């Protein structure tokens, strides 16, 4: 029940919560994109062999992760716009479409990363360096020994450790992207009144909230001006 309350979108807390989710998506998307770029530059560029064949870990960990990071940033920006323009249907549909696509992509990325980490741990990283070390698929031979070791342009033990150190954070960030995108989907469905997320009277509450926001801003500006005027009068009395 508590989880349902947190995921629900209402007129009181929904806009601010949607804005925070949008900011979180932008942050997580940028970090995930950066991790994918570092992973490619430090590890996976050594894995791609000259023949153009790429290991499955490369595809799942880098391509999908980078795409999910870029899309998460886009969803975060749309969520920020939707939180400030609650009565624009186009933003609702755009948020729903992008968030749903990002939810599926982030979930696929999480499953792919989990599979890549599991396979890499299971075979001790030998699958990552199979093209450079064709003779090291034998589990009885250490990674830093065996035929082909001297021909490899990188340290295979560092490739294994670095790949896991970057994959595991990317896995958690992809899962976070999926959860945040799911909330954006719920918010968009609630704003459009579709399916079980429909709430009676929500549009009227949002219209009242939109009308009250300019009045509240003006009231705060008047209060600030009054405080400044009082401070100025107090300063004049002090000088006198």
From Swiss-Prot:
It is a multi-pass membrane protein. The chain crosses the membrane at residues 21-41, 63-83, 95-115, 163-183. One of its GO terms (cellular component) is membrane. It holds the Pfam family BCLP. The keyword DNA-binding does not apply. InterPro entries: Beta-casein-like. It comes from the Eukaryota. It is found in: Membrane. Belongs to the TMEM54 family. This is Keratinocyte-associated protein 3. It comes from Rattus norvegicus (Rat). The lineage of its organism: Eukaryota, Metazoa, Chordata, Craniata, Vertebrata. The gene is Krtcap3.
């Amino acid at each position: 029940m508590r989880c349902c309350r947190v995921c629900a979108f209402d007129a009181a807390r929904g806009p601010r919560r949607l804005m925070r989710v949008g900011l979180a998506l932008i942050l997580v998307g940028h970090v995930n994109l950066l991790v994918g770029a570092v992973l490619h530059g430090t590890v996976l560029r050594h894995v791609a062999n000259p023949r153009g064949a790429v290991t499955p870990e490369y595809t799942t960990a880098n391509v999908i992760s980078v795409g999910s990071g870029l899309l998460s940033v886009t969803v975060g920006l749309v969520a920020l716009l939707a939180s400030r323009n609650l009565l624009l249907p186009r933003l609702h549909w755009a948020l729903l479409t992008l968030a749903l696509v990002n939810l599926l992509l982030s979930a696929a990325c999480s499953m792919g990363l989990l599979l890549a980490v599991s396979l890499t741990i299971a075979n001790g990283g030998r699958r990552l360096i199979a093209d450079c070390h064709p003779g090291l698929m034998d589990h009885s031979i250490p990674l830093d020994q065996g035929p082909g070791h001297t021909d490899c342009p990188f340290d295979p033990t560092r490739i294994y450790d670095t790949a896991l150190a970057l994959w595991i954070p990317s896995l958690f960030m992809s899962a976070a992207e999926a959860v945040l995108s799911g909330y954006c989907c719920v918010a968009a469905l609630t704003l459009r009144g579709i399916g079980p997320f429909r709430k009676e009277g929500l549009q009227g509450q949002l219209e009242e909230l939109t009308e009250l926001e300019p009045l509240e801003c003006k009231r705060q500006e008047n209060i600030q001006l009054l405080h400044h005027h009082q401070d100025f009068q107090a300063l004049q009395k002090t000088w006198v």
